[in-house]
């Protein structure tokens, strides 16, 4: 039996709605879904969506003995959908901390995190700007990589949520080597790809056009590529970002230098179907690739597709790992 820990994220957003809709469509055989979240939020979403699932409330993940849907009821706020606050931010943190404890103790096979608000978790006193940095620190991960993916395309990021003006200074030969080595290793282990084909993007227009438009390609990216090839890793020279994705069928993963460079094409190809996975953690962690959806919360129009994909990916990765 595959046992999945699912954090509800911010209970005032669309999370309860999309989770019920997703669970209604996901497979039930030999899988237990353990939700860390608010009973009141889920009950409210049940009335909103008309999705009436058999969810058993338990005190601990240790109480799970067979397949099914379970709830560990924590920080049970009487929320108004679309109305977020420090309290809903705090609730998000409580769900996350409890789930991560169980995952680190190997009581669950994977972690699926539903969206949180960076603003409200930080205003509630949480010292991290999001899930990933927290998960890396509490798990002791020395190196990790953010990968967004769908069935057509996978993209890893060298830099993530930083201002564009700070990107060049954050790109180093050492960082590229470290992250690509991690990606190569994790794609072998997690996805069963014996020799991943990796495409790396340049930073500048036309990958600098031989140093005529910037020099990061010649001074940083190409030397990193040379070292990686000496390791036996199959990786391209830095590709011109504006045309690189035309060849997406030729590669297992792209490595982008910054957030929008990699995610604009991904979301164009895979809108509502993309999934976030964190490589380098000692456990499987996936999440849907969207936010809390405060603006549409409570309207019963939220699309659960990305959550379904996130859960299905976690199940697949668990089975590949066996």
From Swiss-Prot:
Whether Signal counts among this entry's keywords is no
Q: Which residues bind a divalent metal cation?
A: 161, 206, 259
Can the keyword Repeat be found in this entry's annotation?
no
Instruction: Tell me one GO biological process term.
Output: pyridoxine biosynthetic process
| Positions annotated to bind substrate | 131-132, 267, 276, 285
**Domain of life of the source:** Bacteria
Give me the reactions it catalyses. 4-(phosphooxy)-L-threonine + NAD(+) = 3-amino-2-oxopropyl phosphate + CO2 + NADH
Q: How is the cofactor bound?
A: Binds 1 divalent metal cation per subunit.
Instruction: Tell me the InterPro entries matching this sequence.
Output: PdxA_fam
Gene Ontology cellular-component terms listed: cytoplasm
Query: Which pathway does this chain act in?
Result: Cofactor biosynthesis; pyridoxine 5'-phosphate biosynthesis; pyridoxine 5'-phosphate from D-erythrose 4-phosphate: step 4/5
Needed cofactors, names only, are: a divalent metal cation
EC number of this enzyme: 1.1.1.262
Q: Where in the cell is it found?
A: Cytoplasm
Q: What does this protein do?
A: Catalyzes the NAD(P)-dependent oxidation of 4-(phosphooxy)-L-threonine (HTP) into 2-amino-3-oxo-4-(phosphooxy)butyric acid which spontaneously decarboxylates to form 3-amino-2-oxopropyl phosphate (AHAP).
Q: What is this protein called?
A: 4-hydroxythreonine-4-phosphate dehydrogenase
């Amino acid at each position: 039996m595959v046992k999945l820990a699912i954090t509800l994220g911010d209970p005032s957003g669309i999370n309860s709605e999309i989770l019920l809709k997703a669970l209604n469509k996901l497979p039930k055989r030999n899988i237990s879904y353990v939700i860390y979240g608010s009973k009141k939020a889920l009950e409210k979403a049940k009335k909103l969506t008309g999705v009436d699932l058999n969810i058993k409330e338990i005190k601990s993940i240790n109480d799970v003995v067979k397949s099914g849907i379970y709830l560990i009821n924590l920080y049970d706020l009487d929320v108004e959908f679309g109305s977020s606050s420090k309290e809903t931010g705090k609730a998000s943190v409580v769900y996350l901390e409890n789930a991560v404890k169980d995952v680190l103790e190997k009581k669950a096979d994977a972690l699926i995190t539903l969206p949180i608000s960076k603003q409200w978790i930080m205003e509630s006193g949480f010292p991290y700007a999001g899930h990933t940095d927290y998960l890396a620190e509490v798990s002791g991960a020395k190196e990790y990589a953010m990968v967004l993916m769908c069935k057509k395309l996978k993209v890893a990021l060298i830099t993530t949520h930083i201002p564009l003006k700070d990107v060049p200074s954050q790109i180093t030969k050492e960082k590229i080597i470290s992250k690509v080595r991690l990606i190569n290793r994790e794609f072998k282990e997690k996805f069963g790809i014996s020799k991943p084909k990796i495409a790396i993007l340049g930073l500048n227009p036309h990958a600098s056009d031989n140093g005529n438009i910037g020099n990061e390609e010649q001074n940083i990216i190409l030397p990193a590529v040379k070292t990686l090839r000496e390791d036996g890793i199959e990786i391209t020279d830095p590709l011109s970002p504006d045309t690189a994705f035309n060849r997406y069928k030729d590669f297992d993963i792209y490595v982008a230098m910054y957030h929008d460079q990699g995610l604009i094409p991904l979301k164009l190809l895979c809108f509502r179907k993309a999934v976030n996975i964190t490589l380098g953690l000692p456990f499987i962690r996936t999440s849907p690739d969207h936010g809390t959806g405060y603006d549409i919360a409570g309207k019963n129009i939220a699309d659960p597709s990305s959550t379904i994909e996130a859960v299905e990916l976690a199940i697949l990765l668990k089975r590949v790992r066996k």
